[in-house]
Amino acid sequence: MRVLRALTAATGLALVLSQQSSAQGTRQFQDAWFWGLKMGATSYASATTSNGGAPLIGGEWLITRTNGGLYLSLDQAFVSTTGNFTDRDADSVYVRNVGLNNLRRFTIAGMVFPAQARNLHPYVGGGFVLNQIGGVALTGAPTAISADSISAKKTAFSPIFIGGVQARFKPMSVFVQGSASPAQHTFFLSNISTNQLAFSLEFGIRYNVGSSIDRDK
């Protein structure tokens, strides 16, 4: 009888410890603030390139709650291509070429976390990305009209859709994710002959720097 009671007590204690361990594992992803570093590649198009690709690096923040969260990201893709724009002066209308170097992106998106496991955390989300060309080199003499045209096509907003998975290890997590964003025809990195999506594939690390809520309240 004593052996039976001891086994029962040990089983109960094991269940409690297992539940506490599982809850702790969940809390390390839920209600957390992650800082991350990433690298990968992105696709792009331009007036002279219908299907280009470039490496990228970046940093990001992921703020999680129970079922969703907020994602912020800054990155740069090392793009080198040629774009163009229509220049209108008093005498004629013609196309001028520009050299394009580097793409900077700021992304903000809402995330949801379906089907969570203890150490594996898939996620999907959507939001907006601000795209900006880092360097634009005009061929020929600049004019006030051409400067305005370049400024108008140098930056563009676009919706973005993100999906990925994060795996938790000690002392940090690793992740892989992909994104898709429709190209805006008013932006230098677009090609009017293709209705193209810009795709990115990224992988990196995230470190949990603390709680995203005030647990003292």
Question: Each PLM stretch: what is its role?
Answer:
Residues 60-143, 207:
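Gram-negative (and chloroplast) outer-membrane scaffold detector with strong preference
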Residues 19-70, 206-217:
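Short glycine/proline- and aromatic-enriched beta-strand/turn motifs that initiate or cap beta-hairpins
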Residues 47-53, 82-89, 134-145, 186-193, ...:
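Outer-membrane beta-barrel translocator domains and adjoining extracellular loop/strand segments
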Residues 27-35, 66-70, 118-124, 155, ...:
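Outer-envelope beta-barrel architecture signal
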Residues 31-33, 51-57, 100-106, 120, ...:
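Residues that define the transmembrane beta-barrel architecture of outer-membrane proteins
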Residues 57-59, 106-110, 124, 161-163, ...:
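Membrane-embedded beta-strands of outer-membrane beta-barrel proteins
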Residues 79-85, 161, 166-217:
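Predominantly the C-terminal beta-signal and adjacent terminal strand-loop region
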Residues 35-41, 72-78, 124-130, 165, ...:
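Transmembrane beta-barrel strands of outer-membrane/channel proteins
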